[in-house]
Amino acid sequence: YQTATAFKNVFMLAGTGVFLTIPIAFFLATVINQKFRGLRLFKTFYFMPVVINRIAISLMFTFILYPKMGPVTVLLREFGIRGVNILGNYATAMPAVCLIYMWCDAGFQMIVFSSGLAAIPDEIYEAAQIDGVSSFQKLRYITIPMMKSTFKIVLVFVFTGAFKMFDLVMGLTSGGPGGATEVPNTLLYNNAFTYSRLGYADSIAVVVVLICLAFSFVVNLVFRQR
């Protein structure tokens, strides 16, 4: 049961990365690709979670979501919502971890997408502008096709990054409550170093490696065909 929950959770993290973080990061990359006042501050703000230690981030969010006096709890109390324990509730703990992970990871993907956008020659956009191409058509027929390799890299990073998740979960919930936020690496750690079930821990590690290799192979195959 714990193993199934751990892999379900890690696929939830990967799904959050693919379907939420990547679109948000791509949008932010298009924003920072424009010239406007405060651009450096904007870049610093969104890239900051990437360079901060994730244990420190987990401690920060543990305080923010603290059920007795955390800022979120105090705010909800003002609206008459009491008894909220986001990280201590089986139903809300994993979605909260996913959102925090998304905030941690979006900055790195934003920078990768920004590099991909900067590599597209301005002359192509200028020619499209002369031909009366709309912004959506530029995005669909110029930007996305020319960033195929960038999207491939980001997809692999997002998926394998979810399977590397350990420190954030350990700092926020230690896999609780009741195993609700267990992921393969926390399950591996507990079995290897707490329960001395080294064979079981090794099997989890092998499955994780095989899944990541299989996903990377499929992504490379799909993008090669396109």
PLM regions with names:
Residues Y1-R226:
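A structural signal for multi-pass alpha-helical bundles of membrane permease subunits
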